[in-house]
Amino acid sequence: MKTFTLPASVLFCFLLLIRGLGAAPPGRSDVYPPPLGSEHNGQVAEDAVSRPKDDSVPEVRAARNSEPQDQGELFQGVDPRALAAVLLQALDRPASPPAVPAGSQQGTPEEAAEALLTESVRSQTHSLPASEIQASAVAPPRPQTQDNDPEADDRSEELEALASLLQELRDFSPSNAKRQQETAAAETETRTHTLTRVNLESPGPERVWRASWGEFQARVPERAPLPPSVPSQFQARMSENVPLPETHQFGEGVSSPKTHLGETLTPLSKAYQSLSAPFPKVRRLEGSFLGGSEAGERLLQQGLAQVEAGRRQAEATRQAAAQEERLADLASDLLLQYLLQGGARQRDLGGRGLQETQQERENEREEEAEQERRGGGEDEVGEEDEEAAEAEAEAEEAERARQNALLFAEEEDGEAGAEDKRSQEEAPGHRRKDAEGTEEGGEEDDDDEEMDPQTIDSLIELSTKLHLPADDVVSIIEEVEEKRKRKKNAPPEPVPPPRAAPAPTHVRSPQPPPPAPARDELPDWNEVLPPWDREEDEVFPPGPYHPFPNYIRPRTLQPPASSRRRHFHHALPPARHHPDLEAQARRAQEEADAEERRLQEQEELENYIEHVLLHRP
């Protein structure tokens, strides 16, 4: 077998080297087939994973790759070192082949080598690192036979000679240095600037594809980081379940499944460089689903919250405007109804002017509008609360309308020299009454009966704010003037006499009782030491200052009050004091003063209400 295998292998190796010296390095894209679709990429990845299952037998691989191929384009872009390693493996495989006829021994090694080379070009020639290829070329794997015979030693020597010859031919090539530099740069770029992406729907080796790190940063948004758990899970699955082709072929030469996984997928990454349309869209969608979901949800929630807040604010503004307009219409209706029914019969308001009342009314309206605006943001308000608020608003409007009606009669006495803007529209009866009044009393009442122009202007402005038309304002003014004239010509009303003030009920303090009659005078010599002059009922028990009953008091000790009171009875109050009577008298005096003040305040309030606010005929 050695005689037939070695010359054919050497010639075939020389032929391959001559054809592959001018091939482009594996890093160039012009050698590869036309761009592939996503389906073809997945199929290639699946073939790359499922191939180790049935590549252990050379005959099966030769049967799978028996399609006719062009010899000129078969090994373009193939690294010579990879071809040398494959040839060495092919030389090693026929060491223990099955028994075949002698006539067909010459063609069998060539067909097996060609099948192995074809399969290696498709699956793994680009993925073998240079260091492993060189190591396998320098130190080829041990033969499968366990016999330590001289034939095995001769074959190993021949293999070493063939490896050295291939190395010399490779060094002799003129374009070898350039190809080595480009290959090293391509491998460095592939190993350092690639990132493995995994499809989340079906994580597995058939869905893995590699992309440039620069393109990944340019296309994937910043808020869409890759999930850290997916690569680790994928690597664990690959290390546990899927064996790699390099592991079956080179045995101990492979360092780790992770390294050969990246090297196996290198053709996919190079093929992806020529694809421009499908993959960026998928990556953009995948990036948006990976990291942009949370950001999108946050943005959506913020937008919905802003829309809801704007809607609530618009609804509150609309409700406040509608409530304000409704209250204004209600106030104008109440004012007009009150004026037409004779509310102008009231008299002056005791010094309160029209401008102050109008300003107070505007302030109250602004406060109500502010309160309604604050409460407008609530969506649900009870009907009872609304009815109570409406009733309260109506009561307030009625009270203000009553006060405004009283203002119409404020200028009853008027000021001299004032001219009415509507003096030309007065009735002729009014002029006749003025003439009769002039003949009888010799006094002119035109100025008294006419309203002040400033008052009319203020009334017009107030009615405008109450949403009343100009015709209604004119009719109201005419009604007020006619009622004032009729009331002016009416007989004077009898003024009720003022109520007499109640007589003050002062509680006087009780008079002190008369002094007690003087007792018998004691001799003068008894004034110094009068201890026997004490009264019978005055007994001083021993206390803290009298520890001993027989204590002799000094002469500086003052006599008791009863002893002193005997000699000055005409100027001092009686001997017996009654504190309870004095306290009762003091309390009675305070109660009388409080009652008097209360009556005075009540009388003043009644006088103010009767003569100033609510004076009725």
Curated annotation (Swiss-Prot):
> What gene does the UniProt entry assign to this protein?
Vgf
Compositional bias ranges of the Low complexity kind: 182-192
Q: What is this protein called?
A: Neurosecretory protein VGF
Q: Name one GO cellular component term.
A: glutamatergic synapse
Residues of the region (Disordered) are 29-75, 94-113, 121-157, 169-192, 348-603
Cystine pairs: none
Q: What is the lineage of its organism?
A: Eukaryota, Metazoa, Chordata, Craniata, Vertebrata
The biased composition feature labelled Acidic residues covers 148-157, 378-397, 437-452
Output compositional bias ranges, type Basic and acidic residues. Answer: 48-64, 418-436, 577-601
Q: Which residues form the signal peptide?
A: 1-23
Query: Where is it expressed, tissue-wise?
Result: Central and peripheral nervous systems, synthesized exclusively in neuronal and neuroendocrine cells. VGF and several of the derived peptides are present in the brain.
One GO BP on record is: response to cold
Q: Which UniProt keywords apply?
A: Amidation, Cleavage on pair of basic residues, Cytoplasmic vesicle, Growth factor, Phosphoprotein, Pyrrolidone carboxylic acid, Secreted, Signal
Instruction: Indicate where the modification Phosphoserine is found in the sequence.
Output: S423
